[in-house]
């Protein structure tokens, strides 16, 4: 795949197909594109906005090149947010995971280091002394005994690791903020998802119906004296 052709098409306001965005991820994981081209791609997508099929294709590529996390329990939930709302809130989804697990419902939390915020889920978990692992025995022991397991994105998704430094340098949200909640390697059937704005909520509603996940969206600007929109 020629990234030059992709970028030229984007300059002409053309949409990419699901297969094309999947192949972009495959190319990223095989180091086919220089950082400058990946930076241009992420910037262009952020300025134009990503389509449902483009997002699904990126998701397909990440899952195809990633490592699955097979958990030996029937039902569990992921509580996750896109980040990038620029409001410098605390880690709402990460905190919620411990509340839910404490209430007795199993949680498979997927997260990463901060790219566009002060602190990501992995920053919080690591600073509390948890060692990241992709060892399935340890992961299953964690969810069995503690009711919660943490899945660090860069251990399971090659593309996330490749684009990490680029995202950090850009300092604004990219399509990978949207992808994080869609590529949990354990593929939970239930998810509570926090989004940065209402446009993202509508986008996820279309995406989730195509991949058949039982989920609830909430707008992450949560405050005590006011209500927050929820999409079920």
How would you name each of these model-derived features?
Residues 1-88, 103:
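Acidic, glycine/proline-rich low-complexity segments that act as flexible tails and inter-domain linkers
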